[in-house]
Regions:
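Long, Lys/Arg- and hydrophobic-enriched amphipathic alpha-helices
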Residues: 3-180
């Protein structure tokens, strides 16, 4: 366990009942981080997952947009797991990157102005097309759909400071306390 802890930069409790991580994913993430460091780049990761300290079993099987038994349908289904964003954050930091921002998808997209964008593009559309746009918007941002299930993390080289999506630019004056 100590070897795994050192590799992933994550303390595994003795009470931990489940250890879920992909050595191959860690390896690829470290390679990507080194490329970012040497080229002054960044990485934006958006996926479903969780921020908790404790690892948990999130292995699941999905077929025809429905969850099913991993062992009963594995040849005809997508097998996946939730990303442990706390672990991901530790790997990125241990690779020398700076975490510039982290949020759930709802806040991230709203900070980028997705609601205003939906209003603008739907302004002159027929009613049914407007309904479709706002249904899709709800799916992306509603906390019961993708809004809180999906997480966003942005990591860059130490000398880059980019905050789009992580600061509410529409209310920047309030953020900076410019309005008394």
């Amino acid at each position: 366990i100590r070897k795994v802890e050192k590799k992933i930069g994550f303390n595994i409790s003795k009470k931990q009942k489940f250890i879920e991580y992909s050595p191959q994913a860690v390896k690829y993430l470290e390679i990507i981080a080194q490329k970012i460091k040497s080229n002054d780049g960044g990485i934006l990761i958006i996926d479903y997952g969780y921020w908790e300290e404790k690892m948990k079993n999130t292995l699941k099987s999905i077929s025809n947009h429905r969850f099913n038994d991993v062992l009963k349908n594995f040849t005809k289904a997508d097998i996946t797991y939730d990303i442990n964003f706390r672990l991901l954050e530790n790997i990125l930091k241990n690779s020398g990157l700076k975490i510039n921002g982290k949020n759930n998808q709802k806040i991230f997209l709203e900070n980028l102005g997705i609601n205003k964008r939906a209003e603008i593009i739907s302004k002159n559309l027929p009613f049914l097309k407007k309904v479709d746009i706002f249904y899709r918007l709800k799916k992306l941002t509603d906390k019961k759909m993708m809004g809180e299930v999906f997480k966003v993390v942005f990591a860059t080289n130490k000398n880059i400071n980019f905050q789009a999506g992580f600061i509410n630019w529409l209310n920047l004056e309030n953020f900076l306390n410019l309005n008394p």
